Amino acid sequence: MNFDFDAGFDTETRELRDMVVRFARRELDSSGRFDDAEDFRRRWLLAGKQGLTGTTVPGEYGGSGLDAVSAAATMEALGYGCADTGFAFSVAAHLFAAVMPIVEFGTGEQRAAWLPALCSGERIAAHAITEPEAGSDALHLRTRARPVDDGHVLSGSKCFITNAPVADVFVVQAATDPRGGFFGLTTFLVEASTPGLTVGRPYDKVGLRGSPTADVHFDDCYVPAGAVLGAEGSGASIFSSSMKWERTCLFAAYLGAMRRVLESTVDHVRDREQFGSPIGGFQAVSHRIVDMLGRYEGARLLLYRAARSLSDGTADEVGPALAKIAVSEAAVQLGLDAVQLRGGLGIMDGEAETLLRDALPARIFSGTNEIQKNNVARALGLGRRRPAARR
């Protein structure tokens, strides 16, 4: 397949992308066992040595210091070269949802204590905000952080936490002022070994099976004052900042997976013959391929536009939201089309049905697509308003 994979990248970024693709193909093959915990740790350490777990972290802390565009290119290459999108998702969630808040809001002491090992792959981070009663309504958390001498005591539960079964540190959002709204949340760095912190059994998910996910419980879990990330009451702004990274750079991994499946689908319809000729020559098939390519390219343009705004400091809420919507919806539809064009082979164990299963959660995590549309509508001045009082 011959269409541009460079997106205007400079030579250094193209070389980095190609290196990541080669590494992923050579070292990150899971032999089909995407849910093997021991193999997950092996591959994580290899990814750390390659610099993938700290791409956007400054060099002084062991990272590569990449900007958002180069980081997105790296994640796209990882998604393209690694058949396990769940593993790529775990790397991206570690980096953009948990490590970047430490980079942007941590004290010098916190950065020095955590970032080197998080970059090298020796340690893994997880971001814990979602709760059974607080999904899209993320500001109304029931996990409480009660102030005590020299620290806080955390009580509550989190669910659907990516990397929870393997995490060494959790970036936890908790309510310090339940009535404070946007300013009522505080972010904490909580070590996995902290007394009172327990992790539930890993979920058995329909997709992203290579990404370990579980509940996390805090039972009167004491954390010292030095565990507060940023200022008390700044948790919502920290979360919002991390979501700009996640909705942009994390979703680049899906671009790589889409391209990989799109290429193999084109090869399939060229080779598969029915009625005496390749099925790619049938208009119904060729038009579907063109639609797949158009969705992929459109989503890619939106994502890299959002990445460039992150790099130059002009990012708002709209760009990452549109990128997240476009990529996730394109991935689901591309997966459906790839399955359909393979016929019976599409519902067997293979990369087409794997992409479809891995893409379904993408419309939900990082803020559901419906919530993203609300955010964009509000930015356009179309938010919900109270009805005018009747006279």
Curated annotation (Swiss-Prot):
What's the Enzyme Commission number for this chain? Answer: 1.3.8.14
Reply yes or no: does the keyword Flavoprotein apply: yes
GO cellular component terms, A-Z? cytoplasm
Name the catalytic site residues. Answer: E246 (proton acceptor)
> What GO MF terms are annotated?
acyl-CoA dehydrogenase activity; flavin adenine dinucleotide binding
The lineage's top-level taxon is Bacteria
Q: Which Pfam families match?
A: Acyl-CoA_dh_1, Acyl-CoA_dh_M, Acyl-CoA_dh_N
What cofactor(s) does the depicted protein rely on? FAD
Q: Which Gene3D superfamilies match?
A: Acyl-CoA dehydrogenase/oxidase, N-terminal domain, Butyryl-CoA Dehydrogenase, subunit A, domain 2, Butyryl-CoA Dehydrogenase, subunit A, domain 3
Which keywords are on file for this protein?
A: FAD, Flavoprotein, Oxidoreductase
Per the record, what are the reactions this protein catalyses?
L-prolyl-[peptidyl-carrier protein] + 2 oxidized [electron-transfer flavoprotein] + H(+) = (1H-pyrrole-2-carbonyl)-[peptidyl-carrier protein] + 2 reduced [electron-transfer flavoprotein]
| Biological process, per Gene Ontology | fatty acid beta-oxidation using acyl-CoA dehydrogenase
Q: Which residues form a coiled coil?
A: none
Q: Which residues bind FAD?
A: R272, Q283
Q: Give disulfide pairs as residue numbers.
A: none
> What function does the entry list?
Involved in the biosynthesis of undecylprodigiosin. Catalyzes the desaturation of the L-prolyl-[prolyl-carrier protein] to yield 1H-pyrrole-2-carbonyl-[prolyl-carrier protein].
Similarity-based family: Belongs to the acyl-CoA dehydrogenase family.
> What name appears for this protein in its UniProt entry?
L-prolyl-[peptidyl-carrier protein] dehydrogenase
**Source organism of the structure:** Streptomyces coelicolor (strain ATCC BAA-471 / A3(2) / M145)
Quick one: which gene encodes this? redW
